[in-house]
Amino acid sequence: MQHWNAIQRLHGRYSKEVNDVLKPKGLSKSQFDLLMTLYHQESATQKSLERTLELSSGAISQTVKKLLAEHLVIRKRINREKRVLLTEQGTKLIQTSAPEIEEIDDRYFRAFTSKDHETFDQLLHKMQSDHF
């Protein structure tokens, strides 16, 4: 129980810091994550976004609708597939927001050695594969 409480406190603190960066830009964390995914993949189907982000089809659909309304993404048919792509405005927003989020991430892991990172990754993988 002690570990879960520590994880919850850490997650709460991290989430607050991330939201403090994203909120003034009009973004939620799930919107940011979707935009980052598109930034790295160029385009994606809603189904692939569901798998990558581990969100329900309804959550992805709502997030995409909000981002469409803000002109941060567009839908486009490519090779018979409906895909979601970043707009120029979406790309610029990610390019300015991502470094701020990376700075927060770096602060949380600054004290880790490379061995610590490796061990941490192994433990997370073990927890996920054993229980999910």
Q: Can you annotate each of these PLM segments?
A:
Residues 1-25, 83, 92:
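N-terminal leader segment of winged-helix/HTH proteins
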Residues 2-5, 33, 48, 118:
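Active-site phosphate/pyrophosphate-handling residues
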Residues 7-10, 14, 53, 93, ...:
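Alpha-helical linker/hinge and terminal dimerization helices associated
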Residues 12, 16-56:
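N-terminal helix-turn-helix DNA-binding core of bacterial DNA-binding proteins
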Residues 56-57, 80:
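Donor nucleotide-sugar binding loop of glycosyltransferases
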Residues 65-122:
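Charged, amphipathic alpha-helical coiled-coil/dimerization segments
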Residues 118-132:
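Exposed, interaction-prone assembly regions rather than primary DNA-binding/catalytic cores
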